[in-house]
Each structure stands twice: as structure tokens, then as C-alpha cells.
Amino acid sequence: MANIKSAIKRAELNVKQNEKNSAQKSALRTVIKAFKANPTEEAFRAASASIDKAASKGLIHKNKASRDKSRLAAKLAN
């Protein structure tokens, strides 16, 4: 455990941020899985919006977001 006051604060903030990021990533995965289960235009739009939002917040890398959207679009086209 950290002894310095600022290190203690950072450790607490890290735990909170980790919980928040985990929840957001889980929600993103859920939306993508919903699209894969039922690939419709509406589900694609929801998944695409969620992916873009995650990328803009820094949750996932912009290149990963682009790759994911491309793969979902290909699945929708088939």
C-alpha cells in the first residue's frame, strides 16, 4: 500500500477509473454481440455509434474502432 498522500489518492482514482472503463468496455461488447446475433441496419447503427463514442473517449484506439466498424459492415453486407 502507498504511504505518500498523493500516491494513495492516485491509487483510489485508478480503482475508480478501472471500474468505469470496465463497465464501458462491457457495454460496448454487449452492443457488438447484439449486432452479431441479429445483424440488422438498426443494430449496426447502434454498434457503430458505441464504437465511435468509445474511440473518442480513448477507451479503444481509433484504428481498432475503424477495424471493428469495417468488420461489422462486412457482416451486414453478407
Curated annotation (Swiss-Prot):
- List the Gene Ontology MF annotations in alphabetical order: small ribosomal subunit rRNA binding; structural constituent of ribosome
A Pfam family cross-referenced in the UniProt record is: Ribosomal_S20p
GO biological process terms on file: translation
Stretches that traverse the bilayer: none
Q: Which domain of life is it from?
A: Bacteria
PANTHER family tied to this protein: 30S RIBOSOMAL PROTEIN S20 (PTHR33398), SMALL RIBOSOMAL SUBUNIT PROTEIN BS20C (PTHR33398:SF1)
Q: What does this protein do?
A: Binds directly to 16S ribosomal RNA.
Put simply, this protein is called: Small ribosomal subunit protein bS20
What lineage does the source organism belong to?
Bacteria, Bacillati, Bacillota, Bacilli, Lactobacillales
